[in-house]
Amino acid sequence: MARVAVLGGTFDPIHLGHLAAAQGVLHLTGVERVIFLPNRQPPHKQGQPVTPAEHRAAMVRLAIADNPAFGFSDLELRRPGPSYTIETVRALAAEHPDWEPAFIIGLDSLLAIRTWREWETLMQSVDFFAVTRPGHDLAAARRLLAELGPRLSGRVRLLEIPGVAVASADLRRLAAAGYPLRYLVPDPVARYIAEHRLYLRGESHGDG
């Protein structure tokens, strides 16, 4: 079985913070690869506009192309409807029976995990790496793990990983204002955004 970590996200756009988190997980956990898995429609963002999947997938592929330890999966992009993690876990097991996956999530996602679909089944099925930057208060996360008990909390590992304090929503606002994204996203991604005029005010990139 290949031990892999799965980093799901909207990646709208992918940025250096995502890549730093993935590299940190590689270094700290001993997984063989990190698989980037863009989602079609995150359940917590239903109704919000999302850049078409082909653009987001292209940006992820460009961002990870120079790292052989990074891989790409379009599994969620091939499935209609919201991307629920429990369904992804089952689909990955069917599509990649040789993988032993763990999921990379942010600390905010860990704190909200009891709102996820079939969350107890999910936590019994896979391990989680909950990542945060050094210096963040972990008290709330530790309280949650204590409440979950050893059976479920044993599936979670808290990881402090140095990274870039940037959010995709902020990058979209910066791009809309004409601010250069160089040094915030990989250079090939910055060029792709510019070439395809993504995130500019008044530009439409919707699927319809």
From Swiss-Prot:
Q: Does the keyword ATP-binding apply?
A: yes
Where on the tree of life does the source sit, at the highest rank? Bacteria
Protein's pathway: Cofactor biosynthesis; NAD(+) biosynthesis; deamido-NAD(+) from nicotinate D-ribonucleotide: step 1/1
Q: Does the keyword Nucleotidyltransferase apply?
A: yes
Q: Which UniProt keywords apply?
A: ATP-binding, NAD, Nucleotide-binding, Nucleotidyltransferase, Pyridine nucleotide biosynthesis, Transferase
Q: Which reaction does it catalyse?
A: nicotinate beta-D-ribonucleotide + ATP + H(+) = deamido-NAD(+) + diphosphate
The record's section on CDD domains has: NMNAT
GO BP terms in the entry:
NAD biosynthetic process
What is this enzyme's class at the first EC digit? Answer: transferase
Single GO molecular function? ATP binding
Pfam families assigned: CTP_transf_like (PF01467)
Enzyme Commission (EC) number: 2.7.7.18
Main function = Catalyzes the reversible adenylation of nicotinate mononucleotide (NaMN) to nicotinic acid adenine dinucleotide (NaAD).
Please give the PANTHER family that the UniProt record associates with this protein.
NICOTINATE-NUCLEOTIDE ADENYLYLTRANSFERASE-RELATED (PTHR39321), PHOSPHOPANTETHEINE ADENYLYLTRANSFERASE (PTHR39321:SF3)
- In which family does this protein belong, per the annotation? Belongs to the NadD family.
What is the protein name given in its UniProt record?
Answer: Probable nicotinate-nucleotide adenylyltransferase
**Species, as recorded:** Symbiobacterium thermophilum (strain DSM 24528 / JCM 14929 / IAM 14863 / T)
Q: What is the lineage of its organism?
A: Bacteria, Bacillati, Bacillota, Clostridia, Eubacteriales
